[in-house]
Amino acid sequence: MRAVALVAAFLAAACATQPAAPRGAPELGVEFTWKDVPPCSNVSPRIIVRDAPAGTARFRVELVDVDSAISRHGGGEVAATPGGVIPAGALKSYRGPCPAQQPITYEMRVQALDASGRVLARGTERLTYTPVRLRR
């Protein structure tokens, strides 16, 4: 029981430190593809972020398996670029899709951060990754 209380306290603290985007904040356009991404690779795909607001210093990126509440695939933070392009392989804590039997839907979540780490905007894109042996 004590362990459950400790885990609950840790999760509450983690949620409290996650900065929220201001109400009415702009939405980012997020674009990526699984093309040329080998299965079970830790090399992140190229990501294009559009409509980043003025003052954006960094992008925080996370890949999430939307079919499993506990399956997060990491990501990382990278410096914002004028064109909003995050090059392939730029996310150092990324674990790519590795579905065993069936296609899985993933969501790429991107936050635009200012220099102090405040969230200015958010955006997502969902794509399904099909295991190589099931592709036609």
Regions found by a protein language model. Give the residues of each.
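Bacterial N-terminal signal peptides
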Residues: 4-14
